[in-house]
């Protein structure tokens, strides 16, 4: 929020609030500041607080986070400790905002002890370490599974592709690496040193967290966090609270079977609520109040307390590499609640032998003493004076009348203490009165008074100053028996020094992160600069203009006789090739390394997801068994992924295996891999084809290819597959596709069958070539190349030792898409040596030309070049598109002569279910109902696009998805939709044609 350079209040005070000029100026500045605040609030992140909060709680949360977030207090539901829960959400978002983002994706962040379902619902790139330390943790995991299941059932379009990212391992045992971590009230069970050890295990350099805080914990045994309405209390080992109603036998059993009571505990109880309380070891909580640094395995971790407000402390821990010279680290803990109090010693019991110190307001003590002094008299019985003091302390009115004078009553005193407090005040007052009287009598009767009276005033002032300097604490000694001055803060001093003989092995640090970011930025800038010069540096032969229509089946002489790139003895690995002065070679090596890392990440993700499910079902790393509630746990996962299943040693599956599905691997205590029929193991969709590890390892075995890559970038239906058929020469070529569906289509078009030896030999997927033996070829023909990662294309060329790759695709249709949103993808786009464009379609009817041009003008940014802006059609069909509103899936016109497309898997599943209800053929259900992504490359006479939801779906706004959907047909296209969807690009453009 912008701050004004003027102080409005001072301006009014100096110029007068009634002056016309001053008033106008003040009004203008006030309006500007208000406008800035409103605009800032509109730009801020909207945070919806569903917990019902009273007025005071609402002010507290707005006071702490109202300036940062656009808070919406919806008052939807009554929740336990509502303010604490609402603050916890804001604390989580605040801590996440402390860390950098890469583009639109946030860097991977760890969460120690957090709620993984919160991150799942918001789509955060966060891995949660949520160990099951007891039954309470298992209860929370079960509750979160139910929450996940509910949101998936209610909104499958949004959550069907999300996978919760968490593990059930303690933070110190988890091996996920990340620079940043948050701990929202997760440090109570770990302590400061435990958090540091966990940070070291994860290679983390920066932690930000929150916890409940009260400085009085350092000297009191119990206290109260007023804003949070939370009472805390220390529980000493082997002792019992007076409120503890646990049966005696249970207490004895607990003492014999557990060691938790060997430590002093601290309990947090929320007042007027019967929810479960929080109990932690006091030594762990205390460490955040007293500790400052911790050295562990070559790293020094420093704790800094950032903000303490409304009973919540925000802190950060930063890992520091290198030798640390000696430095005095000092911090203070302030007790703001004590500034208005004084300690008063009172008797514990009636025998007046034992005494304790209680806190009492200074104003109460002062006013009570004043009343006591007014009523004090040697002739009055002490009991009468005692009654007067007790009357003041126990008064229910805001004012009391003593000797005809109105006085303010003090703070309410605990009923069990106020008698003793009154006695202590009486004794203290009497002692003061008598001591002062004796001092005056003694002073008045001595020669010192007469001596001082004879001195001049300057001399008296000088002697008084000398006495004060020599005797600064001159006061009645016995006063300390009743009053104790309470310090408003405590300090902790520590000398931090780390001196190692060897250099520290810094896994990751903030400096390293910054250095890498700078290097990446420079490298990207250099790549952009050299792209324009790449063609002139490495001259290549041009493809003739009639490539798409050429019927010459023999390879061109320039292809077979192309000179190879000069190789250097130093370029023996992909890593060294990335530093090659030949830009093209460095780009290809970088893309191959990225593709290998990406496939390895997919494999690790699959293992992590399976391991999480195995642990959630009660499995471990030693025994081949799961808990009895396995169906309850896997029900939720089965909704997200229908291929999630459990294989029992008897050969039985928990769910029926879908027809045509065969699992190649499974997961149990031995990890992922092929399993025997007599084993207990779990599976999911990643277990059907588990080839990521093999693809990652195979790619690293080859160097970047030096051959020429040519791209024919054609519009939909321009005859790319026809051109491949004409160019194919079995003596020198192999045809590569991105997926199995495309391979089957090309085999059918080329050989009129899909499973013959010739068809499977000459038309193969890129995965098949990398994973299996294959013959070397001179030329590779690639269909739908935009669906391939550039690194995989290079790996295929390198394995086949091809000198040329002729690639066909549409750069404006759906391209390669990462299945891991956290992976920083930079080199996936194909970088050809030469490009030819085809802008004539033979498939799409004439009215589709207008529809696509309309979509391009609406969806693409102004100034974006698109070949569809000038594309033309050779089709004789003039009118093909239509739109139809339907009430539900039962109203969709399903016929086996049409091809059906959906944007989402949920709509696809609904259509297939409806087709089964109508007893339609399995061939139609399996092969003629597809998603848009699965339909890329398909060509059909009659196509129907179906939308069954009106909930927000960004795919209907994306030009590339809408383009694929409306360009699959030759004769007719029908858009059947339920209701109206805001931003529906296809519906808007169909209405204009």
UniProtKB/Swiss-Prot annotation:
Q: Where is this region: Methyltransferase?
A: 50-408
Summarize subunit and interaction data from the UniProt record for this chain: Interacts with RNA-directed RNA polymerase 2a.
Domain ((+)RNA virus helicase ATP-binding) ranges: 682-838
Q: Which residues form the (+)RNA virus helicase C-terminal domain?
A: 839-993
GO molecular-function term, one example from the UniProt record: mRNA methyltransferase activity
Q: Which PROSITE patterns match?
A: ALPHAVIRUS_MT, PSRV_HELICASE
Name of the protein in question: Replication protein 1a
Record's superkingdom?
A: Viruses
Lineage of producing organism: Viruses, Riboviria, Orthornavirae, Kitrinoviricota, Alsuviricetes
The ranges of region (Disordered) come to 525-581
**The Alphavirus-like MT domain, residue ranges:** 72-289
Is the Methyltransferase keyword given for this protein? Answer: yes
């Amino acid at each position: 929020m912008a701050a004004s350079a003027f102080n409005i209040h001072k301006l009014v005070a100096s110029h007068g609030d009634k002056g016309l000029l001053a008033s106008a100026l003040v009004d203008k500045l006030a309006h500007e500041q208000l406008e800035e605040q409103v605009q800032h609030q509109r730009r801020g992140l909207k945070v919806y607080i569903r917990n019902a909060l009273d007025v005071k709680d609402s002010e507290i949360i707005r006071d702490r986070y109202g300036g940062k977030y656009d808070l919406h207090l919806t008052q939807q539901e009554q929740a336990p400790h509502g303010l604490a829960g609402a603050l916890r959400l804001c604390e989580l978002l605040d801590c996440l905002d402390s860390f950098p983002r890469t583009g639109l994706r946030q860097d991977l962040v760890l969460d120690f002890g957090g709620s993984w379902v919160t991150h799942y619902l918001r789509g955060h790139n966060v891995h949660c370490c949520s160990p099951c330390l007891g039954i309470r943790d298992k209860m929370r995991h079960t509750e979160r599974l139910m929450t996940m299941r509910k949101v998936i059932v209610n909104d499958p379009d949004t959550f069907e592709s999300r996978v919760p990212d968490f593990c059930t391992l303690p933070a110190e045992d988890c091996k996920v690496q990340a620079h940043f971590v948050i701990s929202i009230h997760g440090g109570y069970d770990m302590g400061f040193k435990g958090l540091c050890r966990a940070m070291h295990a994860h290679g983390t350099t920066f932690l930000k967290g929150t916890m409940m805080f009260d400085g009085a914990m350092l000297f009191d045994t119990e206290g109260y966090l007023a804003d949070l309405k939370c009472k805390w209390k220390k529980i000493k080992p082997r002792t019992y609270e007076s409120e503890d109603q646990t049966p005696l036998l249970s207490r004895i059993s607990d003492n014999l079977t557990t060691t938790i009571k060997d430590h002093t505990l601290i309990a947090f109880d929320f007042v007027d609520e019967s929810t479960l309380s929080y109990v932690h070891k006091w030594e762990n909580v205390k460490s955040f109040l007293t500790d400052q640094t911790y050295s562990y395995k070559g790293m020094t971790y420093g704790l800094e307390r950032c903000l303490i407000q409304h009973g919540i402390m925000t802190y950060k821990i930063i890992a520091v590499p290198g030798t640390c010279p000696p430095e005095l680290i000092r911090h203070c803990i302030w007790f703001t609640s004590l500034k208005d109090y004084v300690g008063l010693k009172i008797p514990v019991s009636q025998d007046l032998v034992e005494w304790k110190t209680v806190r009492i307001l200074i104003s109460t003590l002062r006013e009570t003493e004043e009343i006591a002094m007014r009523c004090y008299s040697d002739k009055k019985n002490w009991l009468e004076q005692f009654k007067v003091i007790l009357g003041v302390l126990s008064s229910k009115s805001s004012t009391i009348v003593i000797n005809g004078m109105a006085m303010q009553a003090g703070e309410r005193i605990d009923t069990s203490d106020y008698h003793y407090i009154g006695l202590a005040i009486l004794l203290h007052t009497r002692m003061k009165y008598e001591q002062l009287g004796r001092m005056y009598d003694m002073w008045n009767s001595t020669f010192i008074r007469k001596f001082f009276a004879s001195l001049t005033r300057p001399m008296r002032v000088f002697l008084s100053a000398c006495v004060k300097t020599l005797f600064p604490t001159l006061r009645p000694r016995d006063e300390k028996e009743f009053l104790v001055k309470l310090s408003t803060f405590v300090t902790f001093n520590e000398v931090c020094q780390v001196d190692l003989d060897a250099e520290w092995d810094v896994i990751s640090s903030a400096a390293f992160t910054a250095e890498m970011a700078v290097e990446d930025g420079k490298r990207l800038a250099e790549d952009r600069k050299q792209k324009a010069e790449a063609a002139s540096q490495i001259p290549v032969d041009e493809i003739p203009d009639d490539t798409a229509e050429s019927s010459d089946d023999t390879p061109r002489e320039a292809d077979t006789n192309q000179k190879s790139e000069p190789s250097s003895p130093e370029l023996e690995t992909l890593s060294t090739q990335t530093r090659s002065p030949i830009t093209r070679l460095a780009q290809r090596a970088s893309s191959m390394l990225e593709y290998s890392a990406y496939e390895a990440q997919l494999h690790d993700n699959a293992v992590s997801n399976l391991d999480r499910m195995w642990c959630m079902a009660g499995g471990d790393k030693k025994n081949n068994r799961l808990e009895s509630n396995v169906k309850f746990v896997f029900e939720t996962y089965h909704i997200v992924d229908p291929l999630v299943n459990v294989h029992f040693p008897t050969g039985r599956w928990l769910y029926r295996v879908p027809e045509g599905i065969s699992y190649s691997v499974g997961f149990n205590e031995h990890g992922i891999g092929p399993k025997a029929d007599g084993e207990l193991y779990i599976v999911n969709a990643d277990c059907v084809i588990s080839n990521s590890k093999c693809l990652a390892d195979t790619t690293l075995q080859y160097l970047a290819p030096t051959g020429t890559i040519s791209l024919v970038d054609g519009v939909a239906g321009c005859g790319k597959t026809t051109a491949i058929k004409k160019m194919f020469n079995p003596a020198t070529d192999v045809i590569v596709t991105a997926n199995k569906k495309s391979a089957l289509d090309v085999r059918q078009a080329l050989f009129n069958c899909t499973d013959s030896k010739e068809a499977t030999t000459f038309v193969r997927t890129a995965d098949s070539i990398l994973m299996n033996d294959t013959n070397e070829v001179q030329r590779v023909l690639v269909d739908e190349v935009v669906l391939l990662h550039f690194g995989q294309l290079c790996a295929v060329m390198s394995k086949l030792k091809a000198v040329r790759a002729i690639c066909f695709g549409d750069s404006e249709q759906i391209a390669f898409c990462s299945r891991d949103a956290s992976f920083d993808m930079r080199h996936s786009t194909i970088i050809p040596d030469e490009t030819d464009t085809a802008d004539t379609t033979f498939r799409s009817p004439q009215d589709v030309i207008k529809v696509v041009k309309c979509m391009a003008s609406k969806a693409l940014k102004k100034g974006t070049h698109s070949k569809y802006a000038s594309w033309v059609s050779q089709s004789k069909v003039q009118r093909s598109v239509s739109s139809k509103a339907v009430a539900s899936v039962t109203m969709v016109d399903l016929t086996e002569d049409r091809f059906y497309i959906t944007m989402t898997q949920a709509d696809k599943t609904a259509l297939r279910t409806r087709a089964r209800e109508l007893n339609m053929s399995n061939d139609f259900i399996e092969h003629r109902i597809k998603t848009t992504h699965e339909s890329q490359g398909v060509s059909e006479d009659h196509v129907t696009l179906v939308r069954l939801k009106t909930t927000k779906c960004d795919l209907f706004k994306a030009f590339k998805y809408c383009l694929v959907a409306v360009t699959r047909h030759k004769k007719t296209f029908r858009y059947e939709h339920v209701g109206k969807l805001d931003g529906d690009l296809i519906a808007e453009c169909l209405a204009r044609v």
